[in-house]
Amino acid sequence: MRKFLMAACAAVLGIGLSAGTATAASAWASRTIVVRPGQSIQAAVNRASPGDTVLIKPGVYHQSVQIRTDGITLRGSGDFYGGTVLVPPKSFPKTLCNAAFGPTGVCILAKSVNPKTGAVIRSVRDDTVTGLLVTRFPGNGVFGYGTDGLTVTRVTAINDGDYGISRFVSTRTLFADDVAIGNHEAGFYVGDSPDADTVVRDDQAYGNQFGIFIRHAREVQVTRNRVSGNCQGILVLDDGQRGGAGNVAIVSNTVFRNNKFCAKSEDTPVATQGGGILLLGATFSRVAHNSVTGNSGSQFNSGGIVVLSAKMISQGSNPNFDTIAFNSAFRNHRADLRWDGTGIGVRFVGNVCRTSVPPGLCH
């Protein structure tokens, strides 16, 4: 998926680089634009100005939505069946998002992008998506690219083809009180952001390939999430790009029975199963006060809390200056705690567990 994204940005976003300039919010009184079943959500979004709310009444909407205006709130009437449900239309609109990133439920896209490189020139700022169920999209559920200050809250993404709830090349993101179930790649994804300044909290991730996936990003907080039934619960990956991955705080999460099997693929060159929390080449990261239980498998990622070099997998870094502290880890296989011995400044402190590789990491 990521390879496709990077190539598509240069090839497709050049078709139409910039969104129209929105009128300043101060020139408008904030409005609520109501959408009812049978009406177009996109038409309401196109009418909205900074500060406006697009309120979607309960119902099933066969629609795909693109947002490129600052300060819009897209508010559904509940992230459950019987609330506001977005499902794929028979024919997807020819938006830049759908062309570049695959058919997507809700896409929040930068105002301006470099046509040659896909680099963000001008972010879209301070948008909110809340109260929706987004399901069965061949691409992504909710997808942000080139956003600043994006909030996604009380959204459920089920059985989407790539990512459930994700953001690329963005900063100041909040994913809170969301649910991601059965998405083909990651339930929650934070990537390609050296200054992510992102919080993923109080979310639930079940039955995805990766529950919560942090790749090529720094300054991320992952806290108070419940993660179960995935091939890998929480992953921080240095994929070899400049800047690496790290400065991630994974704190007070419940990570249990992530025992789904995922075969290797073009995007994932090794099979995965039974992984709780994995730091793969991450640096300057902290894993603390988590409950990690019942994650079992025989793959490279298998175990409760696992710290490995990314050099062999993705030509990334060794796991330098990471701290694994005061976690509870039990009934995990290949071990409750695993470290391949690479890197410098890696510390295991006060962890309550029974098995570790190498021996002696448990308190």
Q: Could you say what each language-model-derived stretch is?
A:
Residues 25-32, 46, 50, 151, ...:
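Post-signal peptide N-terminal regions of Sec-secreted extracellular proteins
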Residues 90-119, 136-143, 159-166, 182-195, ...:
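Extracellular beta-strand/beta-solenoid scaffold signature
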Residues 32-39, 71-138:
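Right-handed parallel beta-helix/beta-spiral solenoid domain characteristic of secreted/periplasmic
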Residues 38-43, 50-73, 77-84:
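N-terminal extracellular ligand-recognition/capping segment immediately after the signal peptide
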Residues 1-9:
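Bacterial N-terminal signal peptides that target proteins for export
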Residues 77, 122-136, 148-163, 171-186, ...:
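Right-handed parallel beta-helix
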Residues 14-17, 21-46:
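Right-handed parallel beta-helix/beta-solenoid
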